[in-house]
A protein has these predicted regions:
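Periplasmic-binding protein-like
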Residues: 56, 133-141, 210, 214-258, ...
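Acidic, polar ligand-binding/catalytic clefts
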Residues: 75, 79, 83, 90-154, ...
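Alpha-to-beta junction loops
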Residues: 87-89, 105-114, 195-208, 217-219
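Extracytoplasmic small-molecule ligand-binding "clamshell" domains
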Residues: 24-115, 124
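Ligand-binding clefts/hinges and TM-proximal coupling segments of bilobed small-molecule sensing domains
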Residues: 24-35, 42, 167-184, 224-225, ...
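Bacterial N-terminal signal peptides that target proteins for export
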Residues: 1-9
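Bacterial N-terminal signal peptides
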Residues: 9-18
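Bilobed "Venus flytrap"/periplasmic-binding protein-like clamshell domains
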Residues: 56-59, 68-84, 117, 138-191, ...
Length: 280
């Protein structure tokens, strides 16, 4: 997923919202784990510590607070994992984005919970847990739109704003061949085109769109239309926690903890806290 910088003021406000209040608005947390499968606790004897690595400028996943500490969905999830594994030696350290993978490789960090996408290229260097979120594509339209659906038939001969040379553009070319594509150099420019009425619909990253729709930049102009498109051939296999290739014990421990955190409802609480307009 492209690294989009969303408004910190919005994220800080989200952090103060209660999960119950958000859930009441109908947002449903996704599930990436089989609720009927009881995870088997692995042997944790070989794991002496977990040094989580993340960044601090990719809200709502990780961001710096005024007091210098870090917060966000990734940060809270790391804390929940530490609590589930009952590790006293468990830290969350910030790194610049381009230094996170090198830190795993040189052993100065143990696990990267920094929105790293699971790709074939990444798997050559790192091991990943099962995905803890995905990055599907989704359509948005203006609130005064007459479009009742976001289907190839409904969008035939309609203009769709999309970022140029992106997976989203490639997807549209394949599955919406009769639509008119208005391409833009950035996702922000494509969003502005929809807001200003220069396109009938917008197609882009669902997570980024969810925060744009809820933020000041959108000006309450727009809304999602229909559900997400999660074709892994275009949008990847999701995002996981990365560990050094040889650290099998830690990967198994993290997978176990993620499944347990999900079963206990903690994952859903965190999701509802940070995603007031569900991207899925």
């Amino acid at each position: 997923m492209a690294r989009r910088r969303l408004g910190l003021a919005l994220v800080a406000a989200l952090a103060l919202l209660s999960p119950g209040a958000i859930a009441a608005e109908g947002v449903v947390a996704p599930s990436f784990w089989d609720p009927g499968r009881k995870p088997e606790k692995p042997d944790l004897a070989a794991i002496k510590q977990i040094r989580f690595l993340t960044e601090d400028d990719f809200p709502p996943f990780d961001f710096a607070l005024p007091d210098g500490s870090i917060a966000g969905f990734n940060v809270d999830l790391a804390r929940a994992i530490c609590e589930e594994l009952e590790f006293s030696s468990c830290t969350i350290q910030r790194r610049r984005w381009d230094l996170i993978v090198p830190a795993l490789e040189d052993g100065s960090g143990d696990a990267a919970i920094a929105s790293l996408k699971i790709t074939d290229a990444a798997r050559e260097k790192l091991d990943f847990t099962a995905p803890y979120y995905t990055t599907p594509g989704r359509f948005a339209v203006r609130k005064d739109s007459v479009l009742a659906a976001a289907t190839p038939a409904a969008l035939e001969e309609r203009t769709i704003a999309v970022q140029a040379d992106s997976a989203h553009e490639a997807f549209l070319k394949t599955f919406f061949p009769k639509s008119k594509l208005a391409t833009f150099p950035t996702a922000q420019a494509a969003r502005t085109a929809l807001k200003e009425g220069r396109a009938h619909a917008l197609f882009g990253d669902a997570i980024a769109l969810s925060f744009w729709l809820n933020g000041q930049d959108a000006g309450d102009c727009c809304m999602f239309r229909d559900g997400p498109f999660a074709d892994p051939g275009y949008f990847g296999d999701g995002v996981g926690i990365a560990v050094k290739k040889s650290n099998i014990a830690l990967r198994r421990a993290l997978d176990y903890a993620l499944a347990r955190v999900a079963q206990k409802g903690v994952y859903a609480e965190l999701y509802l806290k940070y995603f007031p307009i569900g991207p899925y």
